[in-house]
From Swiss-Prot:
Probably involved in the regulation of the fatty acid metabolic process in chloroplasts, especially chloroplastic galactolipids monogalactosyldiacylglycerol (MGDG) and digalactosyldiacylglycerol (DGDG). Residues 59-164, 257-275 are stromal. It is a multi-pass membrane protein. This is Protein CHLOROPLAST J-LIKE DOMAIN 1, chloroplastic. Keywords: Chloroplast, Membrane, Plastid, Plastid inner membrane, Transit peptide, Transmembrane, Transmembrane helix.
Length: 294
């Protein structure tokens, strides 16, 4: 009996030990396993990124040429000018406002002014063959005659002045020519005064045709390059005026030399009226240069 009892006890202990060493499978509820974690249906971005994305989208739309924004954009309201005003007046207003905006550091206003001016320039190019669009709004002279380039790059360029300016130039030429015709003993004084008057007239004409440029300021707050531009205008004005006088003087001298070369004697009328002829011919050439060229 003893051996049998010992055997049964050992078998019971072995069965208990084997059950104790078994891994219990975790009981996972089917309901819990099918439950999905709660998550929002949209992605939330910080407010700064949202505003930045809106700005990028608007900039891309503007760069792509949004037709609705271009249709609503009025360049005349941006520049604060009247559509019937001349283009030279519009250009001066644009240059003044652009300079003020850049000086104050307002980049948004400067960009808006440049966009308005570019749109008006494009309209000018489209209407350059018409001459006048409506009212007294005329195509700018440098756009209307843009393809009429001179043979010499630094030579005079065709630029017809307004009727009022042409009358002023004609009056100046007539007055100084009449002065030397009435008073023969003044020598070349009328020519000297007339030359300085036409230097000023041509200088102002060149200034009105100068395209507005973005000013560059140095460390002291002064605009750099302004003196250089004024110097170029003054040098060109002096060159045009004194070049015309030199051409008239050479023409007179060459004419007299040609008469002598052909074996004829110089008439006394030409010989005694040298100052009058040179001054009158110079006045005519200066009138043509100041009225039709720049």
């Amino acid at each position: 009996m003893a051996p049998a009892l010992s055997t049964s006890c050992s078998s019971v202990m072995a069965f208990s030990t084997s059950n104790a060493l078994r891994y219990h499978h975790p009981q996972i509820s089917l309901r819990n396993s099918l439950r999905a974690p709660k998550s929002p249906s949209f992605v939330r971005l910080p407010l700064g990124k949202v505003l930045q994305s809106r700005i990028v989208i608007r900039a891309a739309s503007s760069a792509a040429g949004n037709p609705q924004s271009d249709a609503d954009f009025n360049p005349y309201e941006v520049l604060g000018v009247n559509p019937i005003e001349g283009f030279d007046k519009i250009k001066q207003t644009y240059g003044r406002k652009l300079k003020d905006a850049q000086r104050s550091g307002d980049e948004a206003t400067a960009a808006l002014l440049e966009k308005a001016y570019d749109k008006l320039m494009y309209a000018q190019l489209m209407n350059r063959k018409k001459g006048v669009t409506f009212g007294s709004f005329k195509v700018s002279k440098d756009i209307k005659y843009a393809d009429k380039q001179p043979i010499i790059p630094w030579g005079p360029r065709f630029s017809r002045s307004s009727k009022n300016d042409m009358l002023i130039n004609l009056a100046i030429s007539v007055v100084f020519s009449a002065w030397i015709a009435i008073k023969r003993n003044v020598e070349y004084k009328p020519l000297q005064f007339m030359s300085f008057v036409f230097v000023y007239r041509i200088f102002e004409k060149l200034k009105s045709f100068e395209a507005p440029s973005s000013p560059i300021y140095n460390e002291e707050g002064e605009e750099s390059g302004r003196g250089l531009r004024m110097g170029k205008r003054l040098l060109r004005s002096l060159s045009l005026v004194f070049g015309s006088i030199l051409l008239a003087s050479l023409a007179y001298t060459g004419f007299l030399n040609g008469i002598e070369y052909m074996g004829y004697s110089i008439p006394m009328v030409l010989y005694n009226n040298q100052e009058l002829i040179v001054t009158a011919s110079s006045a005519f050439m200066l009138y043509v240069i100041a009225s039709f060229y720049r």
